[in-house]
Design a protein with these regions (language model features):
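Nucleotide-activated chemistry modules centered on ATP-dependent adenylation/adenylyltransferase
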Residues: 1-159
């Protein structure tokens, strides 16, 4: 079983990562998203945590925020043909989705897919467990993540 931590550098994912290390939980890979729009203080924090968790290595995936914000041409829905997703907000969470998709692609591109299921849907390997730092009071955010094995340690620990 491969254990992969999705780490944003934010308070919840950092609390999860450090608690997993402290508890001796297995960690095979740490994936961190870089939108290119992080504040300097966040970048310093990320570097500080990387030094603290050494020798564990962090795979940083760079995202082109500017492209998705203003250049990407939408292909579906009422906005088909329009450019860009605009500012992310609580209803328009494209940035969250983009980061999640990039993390999943990075993780599973290094771990082959299972053969297609009988219904033709591509299924991720079941020997990878992905960990997300979602706080206990936000547990409703986890209800739609049923496609592959995902764990939410902060929720399990009621943090």
């Amino acid at each position: 079983m491969k254990h992969v931590v999705s780490w944003s550098g934010g308070k919840d994912s950092t609390a999860m990562l450090l608690s997993m290390i402290k508890r001796g939980m297995p960690i095979d890979q740490i994936v961190q998203m870089d939108t290119g729009k992080e504040f300097p203080a966040m970048l310093r924090h990320i570097e500080k945590v990387k030094k603290h968790i050494h020798p564990l290595k962090v795979t940083t995936v760079k995202l082109d925020f500017d492209y998705w914000f203003s250049e990407h041409v939408k292909t579906r829905g009422v906005d088909a043909g329009m450019k860009g997703y605009g500012w992310p907000d609580f209803k328009n969470r494209w940035c969250t989705r983009l980061k999640s998709n990039a993390a999943t692609t990075t993780i599973y591109s290094r771990n082959k897919y299972n053969p297609r299921r009988s219904d033709g849907v591509k299924k991720y390997r079941t020997d990878v467990i992905q960990y997300f730092g979602i706080a206990y009071d936000e547990s409703k955010r986890t209800l739609n993540n049923l496609e592959h094995e995902i764990k939410y340690p902060l929720i399990d620990w009621k943090i």
